[in-house]
């Protein structure tokens, strides 16, 4: 099942590569808002997914979980040397990542929530803004990592992009404490604290 207007426009623009699941459609028309949530499989995106589902239960709207992906070598590399089997493999991997993220977040239980999922080909910020195009939509994102000035230059913030460009409200769900601790371990701070504590 798909809902007409917005999805059709996305398909015509080549953004939507695959619709995965749709649970209990109770008439979310194209003019009714949805909660669009960016999913990557990270702890932050899983926290955003939980926030989106809780808000959907409260407001009785549909959740659209979106995982954005690009072909290996990004779009420019793929345009230079197109290879349809590589594109298909990239899309299939994105679909598998999205299913895995949903399974990790909810163990297959979406109790009372209308949920649709899409793997969308394109740059993350731009694609999420395009998906959250209805009046009344709400875009929910995980706050992401604190990369520092150089990291932000190399990998600009998806959240900042969406806040600047989205036509709807954007909610940035704070990183869960476990994610902050894991990032500290990756940078070596946590290891030093563990050694100093013993």
State the predicted function of each range.
Residues 8, 26-84, 165, 179, ...:
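Small/aliphatic-rich secondary-structure junction motif
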Residues 64-66, 116-120, 171-173:
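General small-molecule cofactor/ligand-binding pocket signal
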Residues 67, 143-144, 174-175:
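Short secondary-structure boundary segments
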Residues 83-97:
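A short acidic, glycine-rich active-site loop
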Residues 103-104, 160:
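Active-site phosphate/pyrophosphate- and oxyanion-stabilizing loops and adjacent acidic/basic residues
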Residues 163-180:
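Short, flexible loop segments at boundaries between secondary-structure elements
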């Amino acid at each position: 099942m798909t809902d007409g207007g917005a999805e059709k426009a996305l398909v015509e623009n080549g953004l939507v590569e695959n619709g995965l699941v749709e649970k209990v459609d109770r008439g979310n028309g194209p003019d009714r808002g949805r909660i669009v949530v960016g999913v990557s499989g990270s702890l932050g995106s899983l926290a955003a997914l939980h926030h989106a589902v809780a808000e959907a239960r409260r407001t009785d709207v549909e959740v659209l979980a979106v995982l954005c992906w690009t072909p290996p070598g990004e779009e420019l590399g793929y345009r230079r040397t197109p290879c349809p089997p590589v594109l298909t493999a990239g899309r299939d991997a994105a679909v598998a990542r999205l299913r895995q993220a949903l399974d990790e977040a909810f163990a297959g239980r979406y109790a009372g929530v209308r949920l649709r999922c899409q793997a969308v080909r394109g740059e993350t910020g731009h694609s999420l803004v395009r998906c959250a195009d209805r009046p009344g939509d709400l875009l929910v994102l995980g706050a992401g990592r604190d990369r520092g000035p150089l990291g932000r230059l190399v990998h600009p913030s998806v959240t900042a992009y969406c806040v600047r460009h989205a036509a709807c409200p954007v909610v940035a769900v704070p990183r869960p404490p476990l994610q902050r601790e894991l990032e500290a371990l990756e940078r070596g701070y946590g290891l030093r604290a563990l050694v100093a504590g013993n």
